[in-house]
């Protein structure tokens, strides 16, 4: 489990491609690798990956074919930086919201507005996922817990503060790029439950 508070952006220094998976080698800081062990879970752009090897602050992850297809890790190249968060430790402050590291879908960057007053990103997603995305609600964006701005039938707006831009890789994204999306699980459960109840009542009334 994760909090959506990105700890660092780290460079992908190599990608070894094999049948059915890619092995990512990510350069981390000594602070991030302190106490990290093989088998631990680390979020890379919001995707929960298992550590397979640690070598001189280089951390290795095996990324399965399905994960490559369903997330933007499939478009990641050597030299790119990914958002990194280690697993949640109970007893410490939680500043974001609980994320599982299981990406639901990808959003396409529709527009970027960077002015002296603001930095806004407009995202477009499949309309079925907009049932779970609400104005002022939370959503995981490349593993970063963010508040939703204006919403439409096909997407939503993000209003990013300088601190978020400094600590994450979101400033690197341009129109047409793909960003990993994890919706809030509690919101999904509530919406799905209400829809089932309403559908059942409608069926009984017919």
Regions found by a protein language model. Name each.
Residues 1-206:
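Conserved loop->alpha-helix
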């Amino acid at each position: 489990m994760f909090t959506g508070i990105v700890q660092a952006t780290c460079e992908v220094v190599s990608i070894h491609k094999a049948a059915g998976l890619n092995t990512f080698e990510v350069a981390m800081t000594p602070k991030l690798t302190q106490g990290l062990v093989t088998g631990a879970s680390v979020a890379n752009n919001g995707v929960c990956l298992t550590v397979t090897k640690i070598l001189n602050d280089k951390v290795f992850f095996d990324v399965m074919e399905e994960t490559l297809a369903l997330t933007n890790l499939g478009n990641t190249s050597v030299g790119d930086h990914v958002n990194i968060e280690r697993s949640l430790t109970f007893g410490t402050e939680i500043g974001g919201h609980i994320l599982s590291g299981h990406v639901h879908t990808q959003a396409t960057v529709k527009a970027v507005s960077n002015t002296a007053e603001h930095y806004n990103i407009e995202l477009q997603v499949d309309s079925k996922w907009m049932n779970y995305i609400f104005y002022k609600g939370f959503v995981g964006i490349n593993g970063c817990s963010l508040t939703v701005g204006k919403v439409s039938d096909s997407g939503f707006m993000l209003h990013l503060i300088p601190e978020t831009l400094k600590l994450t890789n979101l400033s690197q994204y341009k129109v047409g790029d793909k960003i990993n999306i994890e919706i809030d699980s509690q919101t999904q459960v509530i919406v799905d439950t209400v829809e089932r109840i309403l559908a059942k009542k409608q069926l009984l009334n017919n």
